[in-house]
Amino acid sequence: MNKLPIISLILLLVAGCIEDFDLNPGSAVPKMVVEALITNKPGPYLIRLTESHTGKFVDPDFSNIDDAKGIINAEIIISDDVNQVDTLVPMVFNRDEYLYNYRLGYYKIIYDGSGNIIDTVYWKYPVEFNPERGFYMTTHLRGIPGRTYFLKIVSEGKEYDSHSFMPEVPDIDSLGYIKKIMEKDGQEYYVPLIYFSEPQGIKNYYLIQLEEEINSRLFSETNWRFSILSDEFLESYVNGLNISLGSNPRNFEYPEYWAGDYIYVGLSSLTKEAYDFYNSLLLQFKNDGGAYQLSPGSPPTNMSNGALGFFRASAISERKIKIPYSFE
């Protein structure tokens, strides 16, 4: 006798939960997105400024999507805690200033007032560089572990600030690799191993890269070449860590190496804030939109005034090895 009222109540509750709601993402005001990195390697260091935008995201291969609008005509200054100051300049390639050699690539020779050669500068970036993409570069700054760096950006009358400490990084003692067999065809391939001493008594966070920093910032590939690491479960000596066991987004896999290939590994120091930033990005990349997934949102930032992105200072330790052919 009571079934009908109960069913009616359920239908009423369900109907009450259905309401058209227009999110209207296109009305969101664009925010500045900052990609900024300083390392202990020789510069110049790159900073990219773009505008955020909203819209549908339907391409699972997000590595090939880069339609962000660059922010130009910004004033960018980086300084440190010992009063070293550098004003960045737009990154533009002027082909007329450079010579070309098929082994050396593009380079230019710097002369003093007497015509003596004092330096040779090599262009290690893509020559098809569009200044509208929002890249800027330092002119003389050199990153040093243990220092704190300050970033100031002025664009369209607004100021954005940040600072980042550069932690020390342990040296990579050596690299190795182990052989794997593909299930589908039985081919042999290799995955890299890393060996290093892990400082004890302090919290350490790392970013492991399987591609040099300049390439990973300017080019996109379908392979996942990054891994973030906390020292929570690391022993005092990291004895052959299998990098390919790291967490990777959907539709991306760690690269497979073959005989004759070179393996590059970079170990970068991270602050806790930088680790949290990358971890948040990774969680977003792995989000499949399911009912039990976290709601999409912007990752944490160390930028002020509502800007997105992150300003990172990292020391880098690097190694490279070649996987020999069996007859070598």
Q: Residues of each region from the PLM?
A:
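C-terminal motif of bacterial Sec signal peptides marking the signal peptidase cleavage site
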Residues: 14-16
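Sec-dependent signal peptide recognition
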Residues: 2-9
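Local alpha-helix boundary/kink/capping signal
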Residues: 11-12, 42
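A sequence/structural signal for flexible, mid-protein segments enriched
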Residues: 18-328
